[in-house]
């Protein structure tokens, strides 16, 4: 792990820097170093935020999976933009990501869905995510029904369950420093295909 926060301010490659910070978090954070706060906005402009798990990232963007019929799924499909904030308290680091959102390919979604535990794949069918639930029993009944339905063979991916990729136009790295004189580096580009510009920010 890098001990000097000054080291990161020299970086010119945001995805490489993110990979290094995520690797540090995997060694330091006790639970879910890939947990991230995902912010969306509803049709009235009212923000929503919730924790999700980052499942993949590369130079094209940051990937997570969800039910497209959920509140966050519907808000993303409508606005086609989102933001993320990673906070690794043990490292006193934060990364903020903003950009347009695209659906992952069916092949990507199928591959990730197939890698999930069987119970999680059943749950994707049983849960009408974000909609009112009359009782815990109703959910458990749905789980039992789909468990019986898919007792033999593979469990197909629900048509409404897939992934999104945030294609960043802004990535900011923050490191805590004494007396709130933090280090901040912001990478921006006009489009997801553009070249990165880098600025150091006042804390």
UniProtKB/Swiss-Prot annotation:
Assigned keywords, A-Z: Flavoprotein, FMN, Oxidoreductase, Pyridoxine biosynthesis
Matching InterPro entries: Pyridox_Oxase, Pyridox_Oxase_CS, Pyridox_Oxase_N, Pyridoxamine_oxidase_dimer_C, Split_barrel_FMN-bd
Residues reported to bind substrate: 55, 112, 116, 120, 180-182
Pathway(s) of this molecule: Cofactor metabolism; pyridoxal 5'-phosphate salvage; pyridoxal 5'-phosphate from pyridoxamine 5'-phosphate: step 1/1; Cofactor metabolism; pyridoxal 5'-phosphate salvage; pyridoxal 5'-phosphate from pyridoxine 5'-phosphate: step 1/1
A Pfam match: PNPOx_N
Cofactor note: Binds 1 FMN per subunit.
Entry's Gene Ontology BP terms: pyridoxine biosynthetic process
Keyword Cell division set for record: no
Residues that bind FMN: 50-55, 65-66, 71-72, 94, 129-130, 174, 184
Catalytic activity: pyridoxamine 5'-phosphate + O2 + H2O = pyridoxal 5'-phosphate + H2O2 + NH4(+); pyridoxine 5'-phosphate + O2 = pyridoxal 5'-phosphate + H2O2
Entries under PROSITE patterns matching the protein: PYRIDOX_OXIDASE
Co-factor requirement: FMN
EC number assigned by the record: 1.4.3.5
Oligomeric and partner information: Homodimer.
PANTHER family referenced in this protein's UniProt entry, alphabetically: PYRIDOXINE-5'-PHOSPHATE OXIDASE (PTHR10851:SF0), PYRIDOXINE-5-PHOSPHATE OXIDASE (PTHR10851)
Family named by the database record: Belongs to the pyridoxamine 5'-phosphate oxidase family.
NCBIfam families named in the record: pdxH, PRK05679.1
Name of protein: Pyridoxine/pyridoxamine 5'-phosphate oxidase
Protein species of origin: Brucella canis (strain ATCC 23365 / NCTC 10854 / RM-666)
């Amino acid at each position: 792990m890098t001990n000097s926060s000054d080291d990161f301010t020299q970086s010119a490659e945001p995805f490489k820097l993110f990979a290094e910070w995520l690797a540090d978090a995997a060694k330091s954070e006790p639970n879910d170093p890939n947990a991230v706060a995902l912010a969306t906005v509803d049709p009235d402009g009212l923000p929503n935020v919730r924790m999700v798990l980052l499942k993949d990232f590369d130079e094209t963007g940051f990937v997570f999976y969800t039910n497209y019929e959920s509140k966050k799924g519907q808000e993303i499909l409508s606005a086609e933009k989102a933001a993320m904030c990673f906070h690794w308290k043990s490292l006193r680091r934060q990364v903020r990501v903003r950009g347009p959102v695209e659906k992952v390919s069916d092949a990507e979604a199928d591959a990730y869905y197939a890698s999930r535990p069987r119970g999680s794949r059943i749950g994707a069918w049983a849960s009408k995510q974000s909609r009112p639930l009359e009782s815990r029993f109703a959910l458990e009944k749905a789980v039992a029904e789909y468990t019986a339905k898919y007792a033999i063979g593979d469990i197909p991916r629900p048509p409404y369950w897939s992934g999104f990729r945030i294609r960043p136009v802004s990535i900011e790295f923050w490191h805590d420093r004494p007396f709130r004189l933090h280090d901040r580096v912001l990478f921006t580009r006009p489009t997801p295909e553009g070249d990165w510009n880098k600025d150091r920010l006042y804390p």
